[in-house]
Amino acid sequence: MAEKTLTRMDLSDAVFREVGLSRNESAQLVESILTHMSDALVRGESVKISSFGTFSVRDKSARIGRNPKTGEEVPIHPRRVLTFRPSHLMKERVANGNRNR
């Protein structure tokens, strides 16, 4: 499996090469998209990208956990967690090793 990580710069470069915007415009576009997605998630909205997947925020309630080293019970505070659920197409694409681009 590849050890490379796709970064904002990689996305910006791809927009530059494939869409034809300037490097600056490409970077601004990527930032704008990520900002819109982040803002929606902060508001508690889901972000659904067709054929890719859905990002959503879930509220987890307080509960009692256990310290694995000591066995001592510790309270786990309520929190919001970000989840991603890939679409069926994305699951298939990953399972097929990206052969069906």
Curated annotation (Swiss-Prot):
The keyword Nucleotide-binding does not apply. Gene3D superfamilies: IHF-like DNA-binding proteins. GO terms for cellular component: cytosol. Keywords: DNA recombination, DNA-binding, Transcription, Transcription regulation, Translation regulation. GO terms for molecular function: DNA binding; structural constituent of chromatin. CDD domains: IHF_A. PROSITE patterns: HISTONE_LIKE (PS00045). The keyword Transcription applies. GO terms for biological process: DNA recombination; positive regulation of metabolic process; regulation of DNA-templated transcription; regulation of translation. Transmembrane segments: none annotated. It comes from the Bacteria. This protein is one of the two subunits of integration host factor, a specific DNA-binding protein that functions in genetic recombination as well as in transcriptional and translational control. Belongs to the bacterial histone-like protein family. Heterodimer of an alpha and a beta chain. This is Integration host factor subunit alpha. It comes from Dinoroseobacter shibae (strain DSM 16493 / NCIMB 14021 / DFL 12). The gene is ihfA.
